[in-house]
């Protein structure tokens, strides 16, 4: 029997706590050919705490997009791979391509780039 692929749930923010878990889930998300939005966050970061419930609401509204949350202290190597310098940082990607980045808890900019890239991803 073939190995089962990682299931990527729609409508929720996927938190990864190990590099192995991150690699498996990111691979599955890339293979889904959906837009991916990654929130690089930290528990000690007030703007991160401010934007977290908004990010959850975006995930509930945009079922065709995969939303990840990565704690930069927990997965420091992943944050380094994405050149995260400040929190929160939101990275937009599709497949292997990094499309965009938002640094800071700028709700309007986060949502605008989400809409822009999800329309491109759907085309």
Swiss-Prot record:
It is found in: Cytoplasm. It comes from the Eukaryota. SUPFAM superfamilies: Thioredoxin-like (SSF52833). One of its GO terms (biological process) is protein folding. The keyword Repeat does not apply. Signal peptide: none annotated. It holds the Pfam family Thioredoxin. InterPro entries: Thioredoxin-like_sf, Thioredoxin_CS, Thioredoxin_domain, Thioredoxin_H-type-like. One of its GO terms (cellular component) is cytosol. Residues 2-119 form the Thioredoxin domain. One of its GO terms (molecular function) is oxidoreductase activity, acting on a sulfur group of donors, disulfide as acceptor. Coiled coil: none annotated. PROSITE patterns: THIOREDOXIN_1, THIOREDOXIN_2. Its main location: cytoplasm. The keyword Disulfide bond applies. Keywords: Cytoplasm, Disulfide bond, Electron transport, Redox-active center, Transport. Disulfide bonds join 45-48. Belongs to the thioredoxin family. Plant H-type subfamily. Participates in various redox reactions through the reversible oxidation of the active center dithiol to a disulfide. The H form is known to activate a number of cytosolic enzymes. This is Thioredoxin H-type. It comes from Brassica oleracea. The lineage of its organism: Eukaryota, Viridiplantae, Streptophyta, Embryophyta, Tracheophyta.
